Amino acid sequence: MKKQLLDITGMSCSACSSRIEKVVNRMQGVEQMSVNLLKNNAHVTFDESIVDEKAIIARIEKLGFGARVHAAGAAAAPVPQQDTAAQEMAEMKQRLIGSLIFAGLVFYQHMGRMWGWPLPSFILGQENELINALLQMLWCIPVLFIDRKYFIHGVRNLLSGAPNMDSLIAVGSGASFIYGLYSVFGMAYAFGHNRLDLLPGFADALYFEASAVILALVTVGKFMEARAKSHTSDAIKALMNLTPKTALVERHGLQGEIPVEEVVTGDVLIVKSGASVPVDGKIIEGSGALDESALTGESLPVDKTIGDKVIGGTINRSGYFKMEATAIGADTALAKIIALVDEATSSKAPIAKLADKVSGYFVPAVIGIAVIAADVWLALGASWHFALTIAISVLVISCPCALGLATPTAIMVGTGRGAKSGILIKSATALETAHKVDTVILDKTGTITSGKPVVTDILPIKVTENELLAFAAGLEKLSEHPLGEAIVAAAEAKQLALPEAGNYKQIPGQGVTAELAGAECAAGNLKLLQELNVDTSTLMDQYDKLASQGKTPLYFVRAGELLGCIAVADTVKPTSKEAIGKLQAMGMRVLMVTGDNRATAEAIRAQVGVDEAVAQVLPQDKEAVVRKLQQEGHIVAMVGDGINDAPALARADVGIAIGAGTDIAIEAADMVLIKSDLLDVAKAIRLSRSVMTNIKENLFWAFIYNAVGIPFAAGVFYTAFGWLLNPLIAAAAMSCSSVSVVTNALRLRFIKL
């Protein structure tokens, strides 16, 4: 299967995107197509052996829309084309100004005669009715020309059997203009045949002002909507702007500045104080304080030195270093983040599919309601003038856009808000599902704990602490075990001189033996001491105490004499307890799963306050724990970082990977926490709840608006209350509904997580 991003032009509302999706998804060989109305693009997955891009594009063009394969930029991540968007905004602004000028003229002339506003005498009085009508028509024609897109797209879609919002506007405005023309011919007939008694009926039904002002108001709404929608992708634009345009490279002993696109893997790059890191890499010389706030949300600079990884787009606030480029273009962390965010905003949440389905039937239903309403009023004895007013009002007040925009705008803004806080959401489905989570499973190592053992206790017997630590490190420095590495690191941190060990031997599951200064020495657990016939009876209380604290005690022997004990532990992250408390305060049950023994698991459970600890769990058992909870009816989020967490992450309703984890875990997850901070789990779920609340608000008001507005426009309340909606007010209301939905979604940018 091949995935392709297509740019699509000519879409005006959700009926358009729904139509494209429906038709393309029916094509043989197409597995899935998801159209993003906000970004005018579509992600399509298809079988190349059956269908290709050309066939898909041709099918879209047959529907009356433009389509082309998206041209990826230097970052090789699918991103909004800002230049195209800016150009479209500029063109729309010109259309808006022209529409308002000429629509304003026809509106002033029409309403001025009714309300006594100052007007030239040659259009006043019964004898000048025809001149007045012709002048209004003259002002109206430029508006029709300026906003001809509504007619071109609307009529084309209407004739193809896929009417959209443009179709409603085209029919409403076009019917008004045609009725105005009919009135002009009627007035000409009245003057030509001296039937001045017919003039008032025609003069009161010109409708040129309705035709022009409807188009102008819709254009105002579209412009405001486009401006608001441009802010929905601010997070992606901000990420795109992080990438520097150039890099300072050192090749063959010479330094020079080159475009970042020319950097290749293995290049040595120089990053001075205040400069941005061009691509991903590792420091090979020097050090710096890296500002990673734009990617992780972490406000304080992070100190980096030789061997540390650096991320392209971060800023070196102080220091000077050389780095080796390890990832460029689409392989950089920043490009992957942009791609993840873009793909998430292009995916559809299940709740969006309901709105899309409704939108697909909405426009034909509205046209039917307009025709039926007009026919009913004619049958009740109303005039053609009244019936036409009803039909036009119904057409222009209905707004499929409000329904279509309700979900994608909230998803896009919410996903961007998450990215700004270091929470990458890979799909809209995950964002929707997360708000229903009632159970959170946390892996222990690397998630609750730091994942890197450290020395916690040094308990010497007959020697000093430093002597014991140096002796232990000398024994362990050839070991590849994480516990041994922790002891060596502690000794090196104190700059202790380590003795040289000989005849080194590793005993699996017990420890190591070696010769130091001619003496037989050993380091290991209680089992090793028992094998060496060292008396352990006095050590049991100490062992139990350390184990109950989640620590692993290691004992050190020289020439059969016990020198002391060093305890090593994978320490709990500073924010883990607070994060678990916040999840519980949000009404969630929190479990910890680990492959560690029961004593260690219980010690960590007591320390951080999880509701339950499941110990000695194999990788496949973690997935089974998730499945069991799901079978009990729980919505489960799994948080982990390792390869052994991948099956459980994939099985969970929402898989959340710690950003410092393995690529496999990140690939299997639905969300990625860049900062590797458990507090962000609560933030992600809180964000999901806020987004879903926003979507429901948008859908509620969009449905209410149409449910109330359409009957009002159809004249349902006219007989009882005398309420009749003017087409101009209907057009204004329609524009406001779309703008209000987008504006409400933009509030998500400022929520506190």
Where are these regions (language model features)?
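Conserved cytosolic catalytic headpiece of P-type ATPases
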Residues: M1, N36-L38, V302-K309, I315, ...
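Actuator/coupling domain of P-type ATPases
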Residues: A55, E61-H70, A75-P80, L134, ...
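Signature of the cytosolic headpiece of P-type E1-E2 ATPases
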Residues: A103, P200, L483, E492-A603, ...
